[in-house]
A protein has these predicted regions:
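Residue-level signal for inorganic ion chemistry
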Residues: 48, 159, 308, 509
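A glycine-rich helix N-cap at a beta->alpha junction
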Residues: 95-130, 134
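Active-site cores that bind ATP or allylic diphosphates and position pyrophosphate for catalysis
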Residues: 136-294, 300, 468
């Protein structure tokens, strides 16, 4: 089909990555009967925006792969919940109680929130709730379950058998100091239940056991099977790929230097290494890496307080190979660009559609946007009207789009509520109004005069055209309720008052009337906010009543 042909050539990055997966498989379905796309989750903290990004992007590649290959696939979310708790995360209650459980597997640490059997189980539940909220289709696998149920026994026994080979790979990557005590096996102490980082005294290939000194110095021998022992994280990666026959895994740039290690170990343990894809990490507004336990940057819940999950998926689609700052200012832009792309999609040919982010966000099943007003404009409305509720916002929306309603435009309705919230939390605290300069004051007076009388408005536009040496424009149908006509007036006033750069005039409008340094097309804003209301706003700005 045309779609299939275009997908095979498409330059969109999910198709690029999907073609690599297909090439690795030499176009053949694996013996297990499906192609496995894996994402990993370290449940030391709550799922964060990076977790979402990884799963969302993997799902985009998985979908692109299905389109080009027609093969069945599976998305697995694998939680490393047998890892020892290295430190108590700063963002959980009952910190003191948690201190007693350091180094114990996360699934053996009590849940500080008191809702689950363990801290690991709590964070796993958060992950699943989180993935379910976004409608991801995935299978959840738990490391604890895989180790303790014996599902990893075969690969663990093979690791004992290939111990020297795996150690050789690992030691080459370690500093001398670390080499002395390093072991690929981490026994779980039968006495304290802690995950131990201790050197091996012996590794017995015949009976699949390891011998080491426990924390109290007692020589101890354990079978590597049944969850007595886990693998260090680098060998663990390779072993998991081998045990599950993983075909694709993406991860953050911080892992990229270790990939060849994971791959080698996977091969030593008897399976081909998967396809990989690296993405750059997210930074907070200060350019620092976002971390789970620190909780800096924008959390998922915070994003969803001010915008839809689709806008977040849109943000994740953009240039995965570039480090992106994740802070609150990016939200309005992501929302508006997402809706621009939705509108564009339904007019595009197949090639352009496959290149459109919304194709990948919605797996080809792209909805129609009902956002009749951009989010940035809603924010300015909320700002200038000090709207406290969604209903107040609808009063303005209906001036502009009389047929729109919360029932027929549910996305718009949500956005109106988001705008009120975003305004209160981010715009209001940072609003700074200023007095106009003499030039700006005169121009604002003229703008108000043009809004009062349509004849005055027309004569201002005529004057601008005359001064610019342009032919007069036919203004018979000129209307003060049309956003474009109002924009012509704002433009003409700026020109007539000799603003060298019209951006300075628009900036003055925003700073004096809205208390912000940038804003929407002001003509569109007037048509939404109302002509009389805008005249009143200009007068308040001229009288200094807006200055806090």
């Amino acid at each position: 089909s045309n779609l299939h042909e275009e997908a095979l050539k498409s330059k969109a990055w999910p198709f690029d990555e999907a073609r690599k997966v297909l090439k690795r498989l030499k176009g053949k379905l694996p013996e297990k009967g499906y192609v496995l796309f894996e994402t990993g989750y370290g449940p030391s903290g709550l799922p964060h925006i990076g977790t979402f990004g990884e799963v969302a992007r993997t799902a985009m590649i998985q979908n692109a792969f299905e389109v080009i290959s027609g093969m069945p696939t599976k998305l697995v979310s694998f939680s490393d919940d047998l890892d020892g708790m290295r430190k108590v995360p700063g963002n959980v209650p009952n910190q003191e109680m948690m201190q007693d459980f350091l180094q114990k597997p996360l699934t053996d640490v009590p849940d500080p929130f008191g809702t689950h059997d363990s801290f690991g189980a709590h964070n796993n539940a958060m992950l699943c709730r989180f993935l379910d909220t976004f409608g991801f289709e995935y299978d959840f696998y738990s490391s604890t379950e895989y180790y303790r149920s014996g599902a990893f026994d075969k690969v663990l026994l093979r690791a004992v058998e290939k111990y020297d080979e795996i150690m050789e790979v690992m030691l080459a990557s370690l500093r001398e100091e670390r080499q002395k005590s390093y072991s690929i096996f981490l026994p779980i102490s039968p006495k304290t239940g802690r995950v131990l980082y201790v050197p091996m005294k012996s590794v017995n290939k015949v009976d699949g056991t390891i011998t080491f000194d426990d924390e109290d110095g007692t020589e101890t021998t354990l079978s590597v099977t049944g969850g007595n022992v886990k693998l260090q994280w680098k060998p663990d990666f390779g072993a998991r790929w081998s045990a599950l026959d993983v075909d694709f895994e993406m991860y953050g740039k911080d892992h990229s230097t270790n990939t060849h290690i994971y791959d080698k170990i996977c091969r030593i343990l008897g399976a081909p290494a998967p396809s990989h894809f690296f993405y750059e990490l997210f930074l907070d507004e200060n350019g620092e890496k976002i971390s789970k336990s620190k909780g800096n940057g924008v959390s998922i819940d915070q994003w969803l307080t001010y915008a839809s999950s689709e806008s977040l998926s849109y943000f994740m689609y953009q240039k995965p190979g570039t480090a992106k700052r994740m802070h609150f200012d990016v939200i309005p832009k992501a929302v508006d660009e997402y809706h621009q792309q939705l509108r564009a999609f339904h007019t595009q040919d197949v090639k352009a559609q496959l290149n459109n982010p919304v194709y990948h966000i919605h797996k080809g099943n792209v909805p129609v946007s009902d956002m009749v007003i951009p989010f940035a404009m809603l924010l300015n409305l909320a700002s200038v009207s000090s709207a406290e509720t969604k209903d107040a916002m609808w009063g303005f929306i209906n001036k502009y789009a009389p047929d729109a309603s919360p029932e027929t435009n549910p996305v718009m309705d949500n956005a109106a509520g988001f705008a009120v919230r975003y305004y209160h939390d981010f715009v209001k605290p940072s609003k700074v109004f200023r007095s106009p300069s003499d030039q700006e004051r005169a121009a604002l007076r003229d703008l108000a005069a043009g809004l009062v009388s349509i004849e005055t408005a027309k004569s201002m536009i005529d004057k601008k055209n005359l001064d610019m040496g342009k032919d007069p424009v036919d203004l018979t149908n000129y209307s003060l309720s049309d956003g474009d006509d109002l924009q012509s007036l704002v433009f003409a006033v700026g020109k007539n008052h000799n603003f060298e750069n019209l951006r300075d005039w628009f900036q003055a409008i925003y700073e004096v009337l809205l208390g912000a340094s940038q804003g929407p097309r002001f003509g569109g804003f007037i048509s939404l906010y109302g002509v009389d209301e805008t005249i009143e706003l200009i007068n308040q700005g001229l009288n200094g009543e807006l200055i806090n």
